Amino acid sequence: MKKVTLGKSGQQMPAVVVGCMRLGEKDKASMNHFIHAAVEQGAYYFDHADIYAGGMSEEIFGEAWIDDPSLRREDMFLQSKCGIRKGYYDLSKDYILESVDGILKRLRTEYLDMLLLHRPDALADPEEVAEAFDILEKSGKVRMFGVSNHKPMQIELLRKYVRQEIVTDQLQFSIPVSNMVANGMEVNMETAGSVDRDGSVLEYCRLNDITIQAWSPFQMPAWKGCFLGNEEYADLNKEIDRLAEQYNVSPTTIAAAWILRHPAHMQIVTGTASEERLGEIIDACRIDLNREEWYRLYLAAGHILP
C-alpha cells in the first residue's frame, strides 16, 4: 500500500481511503468480511458520514468490528463527517457535538481519528465551530479535524478561530472532473478550464500541507454516473483500456492511478461495496504513470493544453 503524509500530522496513512457511503445495505457478516478484505490489503483508513444510509453504514460497521477480536480499534483509522441535515446544513456548536456523539455510538468507538465538516454552512459561525472543536479535542472524542468541499477562503475563515490544524479537504476529483488542475494550466486563457471555480484550492492545499482526499474518483461531471465504459467518454476509455492492457491491470486501476500520480500526494476515497473493485483500486498504488501517459488521459477526457 502506498502511503501519504496526512497533512501536518506527520502520520503516514494509506493512499486509498475506504469510503463507506454504499455499505449500508450489507449485513453484519458481509460488512465484517469487507473490513477484513480492506485491512488485509493495507487499506485500514475508513471514511464515514453520519448521513450515509441514514446512519446505517456506521451502525453496521460498528456491529461488524466490535465483536471480532481480530479487528482491533487501534489498527483502524476511522473518519466521519457531519453538518448535513434533511433540507439544510448545520455546523452549529450543538449540532456538531450531537452528531459526534451519535457517530461514536454507531461506530462503537470512544473516539474518531478524524472529523470533517461535510459541506460549508452559510450560517456557520466559525467561533462556534472552534468551541465545538475544543470540546471534542479536550474530551478525547476527536483527535484530528478537517473539512470537505471547502474553498481556501472558507478554510482561512475557520483558521482565524480554530486552534487545531485543518488536516484534510475532501474534494471531488476524477479525470473528467479536474477543473482544479485545468485552471492551473489554462492561465490567461478565455476557455472553460480557465474559470476559477474553487479559489485555487489545489495550490492552496499544497502550500498549507492540507491533504486532498479525492471523492467520486470515477464520476463524470454533474453526477451523471461512472465514466468507465461510458460511450460519452469513448476516447478516454480507449486510452484507459490501452494502458490497462499495457500494465496488465483493470481500467479501474488506471483511472485511480491517474489521481495518485499527481504530486499533491492525494488520497483517493473509494465508493464501492465490491471487494473485487476495492482490490482494483488498491492495485493503483503499484502503477506509476509517466508524464506522457498522464497527459494523454487528461486530454482524452476532453481537456485542452493551451
Where are these regions (language model features)?
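Short catalytic-loop micro-motif centered on adjacent basic/acidic residues
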Residues: 45-52, 116-117, 143-146
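Short, acidic/polar
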Residues: 26-38, 91-107, 153-157
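N-terminal binding-site loop/beta-alpha segment at the start of enzyme catalytic domains
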Residues: 1-76, 138
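Beta/alpha (TIM)-barrel catalytic core signal, keyed to glycine-rich beta->alpha loops juxtaposed to Asp/Glu
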Residues: 120, 124-306
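Structural motif corresponding to the early beta-alpha repeats
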Residues: 71-94, 118-119
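Acidic-and-aromatic substrate-binding clefts and catalytic sites of carbohydrate-active enzymes
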Residues: 23-29, 49-59, 85-90, 121-125, ...
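Active-site groove signature of glycoside hydrolases
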Residues: 104-125
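A structural motif
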Residues: 43, 109-112, 142, 166
